[in-house]
Amino acid sequence: MIDIHCHILPGIDDGAKDMAEALSLIKLAIEDGVSRIVLTPHLHFGRFENTLSVIKQSFAALEAEVKRADIDIALAYAAEVRLDSEMLDLLAKDELPLYGCYKGQQFMLLEFPHSHIPAGTDMLVKYLKKQNITPVIAHPERNRDLLETPHKIKQFIRLGCWFQVTASSITGHFGEACQALALTYIEQGFIQIVASDAHSVKRRPPLLSQARSKVTALFGEEKAQQLFYDNPYNITASLFER
């Protein structure tokens, strides 16, 4: 499996607090069957100012420790970018931490506020698409607007967005409503990727296998392979070549 959304880079957001916890999280992921991890710290303007240079520096330190500890895992980095017009300034400077390229499109992990979908979000998405950037919308099943009005996701499907649900939503960690919406969206074919959104060993570990088993049982092995390996691989493969 490939995990393309997690907060393992130590000390730069609300994820792993230090190097020791980061290494513990990586080991947990490996034990769970993960072979590649894309580290995606929050880029949340005014809260977590994780510019590309900050992320690169943190990644280099973690990668060195992983090699020193002889841990066998492929690592790369991007960011979970909070929806904000300020992202366009970084995009113009080519300083927005993105996923890789696939079929002529660059992909970006984009986070909506948990409480709502802001007015004008569709215009921002349209602008990104004109720049050949496809947003991968993080955890739509946990957004209050979508929980209350699930069909609102369709406007972003029409715009060409991809969607990533959280593994622990599938297994019920966030409650029955989030679980039901995640499974409904998967059944309807709206979801391309499942990822851990790991933050800590205790609160939200980087575990995918239980969610994969549930998806396999409900929707078949082919669907599970797409969500947990094929699609994550396709949009991040080039990251592991740099």
Summary of predicted features, one role per range:
Residues H44-R47, R82-D84, R142-L146, I170-H173, ...:
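Active-site environment of divalent metal-dependent phosphoester hydrolases
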Residues M1-I71:
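An N-terminally biased module of ancient metal coordination in phosphate/nucleic-acid-related enzymes
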Residues A180-L181:
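Catalytic cores of alpha/beta
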Residues I2-I4, V38-T40, A76-E80, V136-A138, ...:
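Active-site neighborhood of phospho(di)ester-bond hydrolases with catalytic His/Asp-centered motifs
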Residues L208-R242:
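Mid-to-C-terminal alpha-helical segments outside catalytic/metal-binding sites
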Residues E49-Q164:
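Extended substrate/RNA-proximal surfaces in nucleic-acid metabolism proteins
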